[in-house]
């Protein structure tokens, strides 16, 4: 109740506060210490500022270092200083720290060592678990510490009932209930008053308990004390003990049994004063089998089946709440008693102290009456939801009385369905306890993001919990309109705004009502709405990009974990026979598997969020496209209002700028304004609306547009944009346009190729809003001005006939994907590269960007030009040799080298003139090497002498260094042609002299020397008539060849 219990009250007083919850007792070894218990309603899992207050007077049961597994992320283990005090486990950063990191109330937790199913690979690990709540994992440094902690925490978590107290009908806390402090909102920590202070009177406390849910504070069982029995039960809590006032008619809880005599209401050691009866396990409806007035001193004993039924009832209510929050239909039938009290009674137990402050404005759905998804309906088309009627019936059947406030229903002033109703929250709702609600929603969000492995996860469509959604029906985040009163004066004041929103939400209704169809040309732009819509689109694009980045990061982490697990499996196969190594590998594998599971959960959630954001982005994008099409429709009407046309044109450019920027920032998405802007350049043409054209305006409506045009309206161009209509407006009034029907297949075949060519030519030239140069329309087959009365502003904006309409606009389903600006520029650069010779052979594109209005034949596909680096040099050499005047054929270097090698192997087949060999070699022209010729001047005597000296010096060096290398070449032929040693020495000197002469001549003149062919057969070359047995028989060809290749 709301009255503050005394901090230290005499042990002789009685307490007649309703007792609906479990109690605890002091161990027998401490009879002199007043019994205390932990607060049931701590908040946010007791983290930091929301943690429970530690009673400084309570003795410390156990303290020490433990490793605690983190609650989020990769589940890392943090070393913390744990202190077990008064059945509550507090932990700090170290033993000297005073600020509490967190608190865990251990009452009715189950503390035990970890099992293999827990997938915990750390040694000396134990857990404290509670069904339906997060399981805490701790790790000690030794097995002894582990056992000591398990025993101490188990003692603190055990509910002890002395035999003498078992006859008292107390509601026993069920072991499967949620005691965790993370799931409850914060409360003001009340200071304990002195023991002699008087609390508030009982009726006032009862009234307040009716209002805010703090009406049933739990009493505790105490061990029997002799002094308690001797005290006369005259007063309770300092007030005369008398009959309690009966429960009010509107109270959700009947009057319950009182605390037996001898029990006292204890002070809360950790500052929590209030206890809610609305938790599913708190048994808000206990049996009233005792006396109804006076002092409640004795009660019939509760039988064991009563306790079992009590536990079962608590568990059923808990399961119903879990199923309700997760969208799972409950297993009970419609006759279950839980259907006959208001759904606000099943408000989750986290909000017990505050449940009655919100008098049933926002209700959860009763089991089985949860409506279908509302994201597909506009807000003004929804009928009365069936769950609202069910709520009313449940409330009146249960006798909710004045505590239940009916919803208010309002008829919106809409132009659509007049029977649509919109739900509006009650104005009398009191927006209080926002800080508690924030903490509660954050704790709920953490709980929903970390479901236990055996439970069903929350539906992704339910979104996250926020302050406005705690007591409101669960909605899909993709719902475009919230269940709020519509802004009728804003949405429906402008007929054009009604047309846009109506056609986007429900395309089945005709977009142009009869009332406004003739007045569309008076459409005045609302810049604020356009700015708001474009801002939402940009914001949603940023959200999509961030979520996509997160998904990519999680995928990379998942792949790395999977690769690490694969390596671990391979190591287990390789080193499985070793004694200690497999155990470490198994621990490593278990840890990696746990991390992989967590990463997969996060990846699934991130992928679902990305999908929802993408759908929302596409909705916004289609709305912007529809707005763009509306503006283009308005611009193409035959209105004479120049100011309005300029304003509409500015709005079109604003939309195009945003869409172009989004497409450039995120090219992977198809965020292109091609579906609602004109093709670049002269290809942005639109068909005529004349009766002669088979492609009427209705047939050319883009399927991406939410409009389906009605008769009498103008053609809706699917690609407006990039051509300024005002410049075309004046021109089109002067020039009548030709309207040619698309009757022949030849004309249809011209469309796609012409679009590609024109788009390529204009891609890098035109920007958004820049009008390309215009040309005169064709003069043949002129039409009368009366035939183009309705087309003077919306017709052929570039002077082109309807047969040149892009294929992507005529047949939207068959058009190929439009190239981006970067791809078009890259393609233009590739076309401009290449050699000039191949450009002359290819098709010559006109340099002028001005289009030719007359029909031209379709272009052939231009082959990509090769760059200079890709041209084969052999082809150039062949072309140069073919174009050489005189028809002389020259050897390539490869042919010449092959010929010289052949001569080296078979020198006896050639008849070589020795005089030619000793003379100065002739100079030849090598055109492919581009060597300039010099006049052949004979050497002076001084130069000849100098040359002879050099030859002598080099000759001795070469003879010493290369004789032993050349001797073994032709040893097999020495028997056939025997020669004397003198002739061999002369021949050797000649070869050395010729070789040295060729080398010095090449180095001195700086150009290449070669022997010119005398006949078409292989030309004469220095070759020895001597047999190969000559040690230097092949020296001269090698020298000539080396001097040749050295200069290449």
From Swiss-Prot:
Modified residues (Phosphoserine): 247, 251, 314, 459, 461, 472, 591, 777, 801, 848, 854, 867, 940, 1017, 1021, 1024
Pro residues bias spans: 1016-1030
Organism superkingdom: Eukaryota
Ranges of residues in domain PH: 59-158
Biased composition (Basic and acidic residues): 201-233, 815-827
Ranges of biased composition (kind: Polar residues): 1-22, 267-290, 456-465, 712-721, 794-803
Disulfide bonds: none
Sites of Phosphothreonine modification: 744, 784, 920, 1015, 1020
Residues with Phosphotyrosine modification: 492
Keyword Metal-binding set for record: no
Tissue-specificity statement: Highly expressed in heart, kidney and throughout the brain.
Keyword Iron part of the UniProt annotation: no
Basic residues biased stretches: 828-842
PROSITE patterns in the record: PH_DOMAIN
Record InterPro entries: PH-like_dom_sf, PH_domain, PKHA4-7_PH
Compositionally biased region (Low complexity): 687-711
Keywords: Phosphoprotein
Chain spans, region Disordered: 1-36, 165-318, 448-467, 663-746, 793-858, 968-989, 1005-1048
PANTHER family: PHOSPHOINOSITOL 3-PHOSPHATE-BINDING PROTEIN (PTHR12752), PLECKSTRIN HOMOLOGY DOMAIN-CONTAINING FAMILY A MEMBER 6 (PTHR12752:SF5)
Protein name: Pleckstrin homology domain-containing family A member 6
Species for this entry: Homo sapiens (Human)
Gene: PLEKHA6
